[in-house]
């Protein structure tokens, strides 16, 4: 059976950009989280046809501080199915963690204004710690400093519901607790849960207010929240702010170019007086490519949409 052209494009993007996406934090922590739900919810893979690349650099003045790069590509297919590929990685000090996964989703049409997407995720978690990468003045090698590398499976699931201008997301991108990745430092990846919701409110014909909230819960850690609000002008320019329950705040912005590219930026820093003296500035940038604008909708998807319209 011949591989559809759209799938070839998806795998092309994945093959080319996979090496670039070399470094994610265990807990999803992006300021522009509502634009990057595909990284935590496999159900999101069937909604848009796009390629997405983002980077997040924390604590800019500190050497070997956390650096995150993420890549995703996704597309709806015929028969209400959708697919996606994701790479999320993080490097910090001598450690690097990379999660590579594939998603599949199925769309349920509830009404003309409401749809539910169900998603499953499978992939692998790659961990590496290299104490030998530390530069020292000594020419001798410490025999206790050995490179630690391990692999573990990734299994996740998610649900995404849209109703008019409201959306709701729940996902568990990692349903299996991963332990003993590095026995020397007791490296463990816990089961994670994410719940998010958003509502877009039209103020005028040109201006729209977008609000979103996400709650995170990881085993053995307290739940954290993040709230964002932004003002959009004709879906071309968007400016907003994000607040973290940890005491950080961020200013965000996004620019849409000819319905083809979206470029976003966020500047985050500590708001708490106890930590504001520390240099905890974080810069975050992403670019999203609308593949539908480049490739056009596939005949299979257009046919499915026409059938759904006739049935309604």
Where are the regions a protein language model picked out?
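Bacterial N-terminal signal peptides that target proteins for export
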Residues: 1-10
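Cleavable N-terminal signal peptides
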Residues: 11-12, 22
